Amino acid sequence: MVDYLIVGAGFSGATIARVLAEKGRRVKIWEQRPHIGGNMYEKTDENGIRNHVYGPHIFHTNSERVFTFLRRFSDFFPYEHRVLGRIDGKLVPIPFNFTSLETLFPAAQAVRLEERLRAAYPEREKISILDLISSGDGEIRSFGDYVFDRVFVHYTAKQWQQPVTEVDASVINRVPVVLGYDDRYFSDRIQAMPADGYTALFERMLDHPNIEVMLSCDALSHLTLRGGRVFLDGEEFSAPVVYTGAPDALLGFCFGHLPYRSLAFVFEQLPIDSFQPAAVVNYPNEEDFTRITESKKLTGQVLPWRTTILREYPAAYSPGAARGGIPYYPVPNAENQALYQRYREILRAYPGLTLCGRLAEYRYCNMDAAVERALDTAEKLAESASAER
């Protein structure tokens, strides 16, 4: 007998499980994959290097609450993420900043542009590329067009398989232009990485006598929703269910598939000390991959004359396929959000079912936001259970 069933052992499911377990609740987790940690899962290769199997995940937050919670399960070391992009044959900081500008433009033109940008946006440290390309200043607008073309147009087309003009503005605005020399990818007050990796962090988080984890368990082969009630292997299930997976799959895709973009990764082990000058280098233009990550530059491991890189290729999402079978990014637009709301409306009729997480809520979500939302959800679940007793 369990008090809660949680589907998914990523940050959302694991956080909720831990909070409820510490309140004396018995929790069972069903995880579809053969490992915990969701897309944060790390695996050590023959080089002894921990690889982010599902692409680079860098922790950053302004929430002391989230960081305090996670530090219970891992030490962290300071890490400020810096990304370079190959533009016109040169490596420059991404987001595009004044160093990028001075590297790619003639000196006199660079100085003049910096002065005009500071004068036009005196109170701003960052500016959206969409603001630059719509500027009333012709020189600023021309600069914006250059950055838009070199940094956004082709990268976005590769990532989303759509022309940049058809991609939601929220996607474009995730990467600003920096009006200064700050070359950090994130500006959050807290930027750090778990000292011995995300997998170890999840192992400790889920190590509690009130938590049972079942791996390689397809919840959808056991759960059925009917008439506002949840059934488990044909029997009505009265305990609350927290679902962190895709809602369209939960309802048998009755309205069709929610669109996602997927990724494919190619790992390569090399007998060299260093492959590239930054942990991540973006390739926004000619190449068919979008970026290369050098794993040990993320993990902080000191392993001379061996390194592992991963090339990241965007892919169409095809459920269950060997390539592109994992949903990574929801495709944000009004039509897709309306489709999600149709699924959400049906699921509201199930009071024992709680949706939590980036897949369940069909939204792009940083790790810290996922943890914060999970902490809030766990507290509400516990309060609701206490009120019913």
Regions found by a protein language model. Give the residues of each.
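Short hydrophobic core segments
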Residues: 6-7, 30, 235-248
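C-terminal segments that line or cap access tunnels to active or ligand-binding sites in enzymes
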Residues: 239-240, 248-387
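Dinucleotide-binding Rossmann-like beta1-alpha1 core, especially the glycine-rich loop
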Residues: 47-120
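N-terminal Rossmann-like FAD-binding beta1-loop-alpha1 element of flavoenzymes
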Residues: 2-29, 378
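Glycine-rich FAD pyrophosphate-binding loop
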Residues: 21-46
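Active-site/ligand-binding neighborhood in enzyme catalytic cores
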Residues: 88-92, 98-239
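Short, well-ordered alpha-helices that flank and scaffold nucleotide-derived cofactor binding pockets
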Residues: 18, 22, 42, 207, ...
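Conserved beta-strand segments of alpha/beta enzyme cores
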Residues: 26, 50, 75, 210-212
